[in-house]
Design a protein with these regions (language model features):
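Short, small/acidic-rich helices and loops at N termini and domain boundaries
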Residues: 1-82, 344-353, 357-360
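Glycine-biased, small-residue-rich flexible motifs in mid-sequence functional cores and linkers
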Residues: 1-3, 71, 78-360
Length: 360
């Protein structure tokens, strides 16, 4: 519990995971939070950070612990917590604490980020829902930012397909923005999770939303852009994915559709063109080859359930949610086990679900 207090204290002053890693080479977590303000400034913290850590952090820590205690589905995932996403930890500015409401275990499952316009065309909305649904059928968690437009459509597509989805918010979890998404947020909590790096009481501010995007992308194996203008923030998300060495996918549109101009630009720059979910699934093997599915995820024990799942997989594609129903398992457990079976060559992911391959 002491370490949780310390992580929260550092997070309350905006210290990033990158900066903490640098400091941790010379000083322990416990020693760091106990330093006087003058020494904190000498080792590189700003005056504001040093003052906050010494004189204001305790109230933020108390607030966070109170929020966690209010409900069993409210979690504090610190930088050293076993559920902290390894892909996010690899990025340049990982948050020291994630506030999670919902199923925190989903943080460790393979994810696909989906982003796009806040004012999409009807076609864009339809494509976003369909792609999100098909990704969940094939064992991926859909991750987005719960903004109006494409973000919301992606979450809805995953939910309507019986899949799992994560929403990364640009504010604390005691509020929902936009307020029109309160019902969607409640549904996401039931079948996924809301995530934020901001303390629960922190209200939405314009500058928080670009920061939120680095987490959406950082959590994910790849990023799909569905409708984006040339000056869209989605292009920033795509550039982040490139910086993180993750795949970028873009859905093309009509040449006269200004909302597709950003996607066309991304394709010209080397993003993978998406005409169906198969174009995304073809890259799934690369996630493993490039190390984008972590070693920790590969170490999940299969002894009790792998054969049970294999008995329900044949030559015809079967989606993960139907496998879960037949095997009497949760979709989360099925997704983890299917990933393991895929890595050892027992099953393969194809459009429509999973098929059995190799000898059993």
């Amino acid at each position: 519990m002491e370490n949780v207090h310390n992580w929260l204290a550092l997070a309350s002053v905006g210290l990033s995971g990158q900066r903490y890693r640098q400091l941790s080479e010379h000083i322990s977590l416990t020693e760091l939070v106990a330093l006087p303000a003058s020494t904190l400034q000498q080792i590189g913290l700003t005056q504001r950070q040093a003052h906050g850590l010494c004189y204001e952090a305790a109230s933020w820590v108390e607030q966070a612990l109170q929020w966690q205690a209010e409900a069993p589905d409210q979690h504090l995932i610190t930088f050293e917590h076993p559920l902290y996403p390894p892909l996010l930890k690899e990025t340049r500015q990982p948050p020291l604490v994630l506030f999670v409401k919902g199923n925190a275990k989903l943080l460790r499952l393979p994810q696909m980020a989906m982003v796009g316009s806040r004012s999409p065309t009807p076609t864009g909305r339809k494509v976003a829902r369909q792609l999100a649904a098909e990704l969940t059928y094939n064992g991926m968690v859909v991750t987005s930012g719960m903004a109006q437009g494409i973000d919301s459509e992606c979450h809805l597509g995953a939910l309507e397909a019986g899949g799992q989805t994560l929403a990364v918010l640009g504010h604390g979890l005691r509020q929902i923005y936009p307020s029109s998404n309160k019902r969607l947020a409640a549904e996401i909590v039931q079948a996924g999770a809301l995530i934020s790096e901001y303390f629960p009481e922190v209200r939405a501010r314009a500058e928080f939303f670009p920061q939120r995007n680095r987490i959406v992308v950082g959590l994910s194996n790849g990023t799909v852009v569905v409708e984006a203008a040339l000056k869209s923030g989605s292009l920033i998300s795509a550039q982040l994915a490139v910086d993180y060495n993750r795949d970028v996918f873009a859905v093309p549109g009509a040449f006269y559709n200004s909302q597709a101009a950003g996607c066309h630009y991304l394709i010209q720059q080397g993003a993978k063109l998406v005409t169906s979910v198969a174009d995304i699934l073809e890259e799934r093997a690369l996630f493993v080859d490039n190390g984008l599915i972590s070693k920790q995820e590969k170490n999940v024990t299969l002894d009790l359930c792998s054969q049970q799942l294999l008995d329900n997989v044949g030559d015809d594609p079967i989606p993960a949610d139907l496998l879960a129903e037949r095997a009497g398992m949760t979709v989360t457990d099925v997704s983890i086990t299917l990933l393991e079976l895929e890595l050892v060559g027992k099953v393969a992911v194809v459009p429509g679900g999973y098929i059995k391959v190799g000898s059993t």
